[in-house]
Amino acid sequence: GDSFQIMYGINGERKLTEEILPHLAGYEGSLPVRVGNAAYDQKQNDIFGYLMNIIDYYFLNFPGTVGEKEEMWEVVRIIVKTVYGIWRLPDRGIWEIRNEEKHFVFSKVMCWVALDRGVRVASYLKQPDYEVAWRKEADKIKEDIMLNGWNEEIQSFTQSYDSTHADSSL
């Protein structure tokens, strides 16, 4: 997970330190104007779901060479291994919360997406052992979401575990 970053500069920069430009005003005078992005080094567990969704689309729509499939399969295994290690941990979520990490339901859902798409890729590549193992872990994530992310009182999934705030991303 440490080798993955949630964003990069346009030229591939890894360090995107945020700074305020006090001499500038934004749209309709809004302040502060910032360059960079303080979230560049945040932990946002949802990114792996997006990556695996794209990889799944690739396998469905582009035949690729044997070598390309082998390279992509290696990437898939790395991503899934990363998700195994992080899905139980809090993160900053797509909301880029600056002050504390939480168990964001959307992040958990996207970790489930990552494993679900990993299962599909394993199926395409006829890797039944991975398919079975990854489905079991995906089912654990789903069970955790249903147990901790649903609030019976408001009849909705919430932004984070133990919250009463509905999440517009869900």
What positions do the PLM features span?
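Acidic, mature catalytic/reactive cores of soluble proteins
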Residues: 1-170
